[in-house]
Amino acid sequence: MNCVVCSGRATNRNYGAMSCFACKMFFHRTVYKNLLFRCKRIQNCTIHFKIFPKCRACRFQKCLIVGMTLAPLNDGIVSIGNQSDYSYAKLLDDLKFKNDKNYSHFVNFYSLEDPSLADILKDRGIMKLVKRTPKTLNDVDQWSIMMAYSRISYFLDFNFIRDLDSSDKNTLFKYNISRAGCLALAKCAFNENKPKLTFPNDVDAFPSEMYNLCGSSTAVLNQVSGQVIAKFVELKIKDEEYLLLILVMFCNPSISNDFSDKTKLALSSHQQAFCSALFRYCQINYSKSAPTRFTELLSLFGIVNKSVDNMNNLSMMLQFCEPKFQFKRIMQDLFSNSLL
């Protein structure tokens, strides 16, 4: 039998997965020494899993994906144990319930407040949500801040995320919220058969000032807006796959070298759990093609990263060329992300 990490010859079942001695010791050293690696190729080194993963970041990521773990999980919603059908089904039901509740708040409420990311992480009540009416203003500013707030609220509803150190939490959310928002809008556009990212009531995801800045080159905006949707269309991503993918993306311990040991361990163990659940879904629904489907789904992250990078660059250009134009404070925090 082959090692599920590197495809070499497996020696035994180590840390929950059939693996060779080298991968067993690599995983052991990485976890116990709290090592942190960074991939230079946006975590696409092992996208086909046909060659030995020389990139240590992707090698460790593969260890987590195939189920290697040293730490017990402490959050009920992802404690899926031995992947029994009951606990697996309960996980998906819980995620659907949380997502539906979150989306309902997103489309039915608005806020006139202008808090920073740190303000919201400290106290979500600072937003002072107001019920929408037919007379409520429909503009990109309102929808942008509500999208950011709804994504923040969604992730804060997980105990292990809410309990992270405040500094680590700020870094984690600052890096991920734009990506999570991009995925959420792309999923809605895919469901509604739309070619570009829009908020409810067909409000464009980009402010009119950005179209004015681009002039006749609006094709650039359309490309940025449509590239993630195109991947959704290509893969025909299901609701369950989307819900697990956003959590696999969010629980990435490698986005910062400054995370505490506690944060790295919490993110790694929960990312492994969500990866395992996603692979389980692929096994149930795609049978023998499950590994291929799984890697195709993970390839979405590279597209999202590229799209968010382009959005951030366009936003910075707009602020430079139009000094009087001001984004909401939380959007400024996300655009100024030094990790990008």
Swiss-Prot record:
Keyword tags: DNA-binding, Metal-binding, Nucleus, Receptor, Transcription, Transcription regulation, Zinc, Zinc-finger
Matching SUPFAM superfamilies: Glucocorticoid receptor-like (DNA-binding domain), Nuclear receptor ligand-binding domain
UniProt xrefs under Gene3D superfamilies: Erythroid Transcription Factor GATA-1, subunit A (3.30.50.10), Retinoid X Receptor (1.10.565.10)
The keyword Membrane appears for this protein: no
Cellular compartments per GO CC: nucleus
Positions of NR C4-type zinc fingers: 3-23, 39-58
Molecular function as annotated in GO: DNA-binding transcription factor activity; RNA polymerase II cis-regulatory region sequence-specific DNA binding; zinc ion binding
Predominant location category: nucleus
PROSITE patterns xref list: NR_LBD, NUCLEAR_REC_DBD_2
Domain NR LBD: 98-337
Localization, UniProt: Nucleus
DNA-binding region: 1-75
InterPro entries, per the entry: HNF4-like_DBD, NHR-like_dom_sf, Nucl_hrmn_rcpt_lig-bd, Znf_hrmn_rcpt, Znf_NHR/GATA
PANTHER family per UniProt: NUCLEAR HORMONE RECEPTOR FAMILY-RELATED (PTHR45886:SF2), NUCLEAR HORMONE RECEPTOR FAMILY-RELATED-RELATED (PTHR45886)
Function: Orphan nuclear receptor.
Protein name, entry field: Nuclear hormone receptor family member nhr-197
Gene from which the chain derives: nhr-197
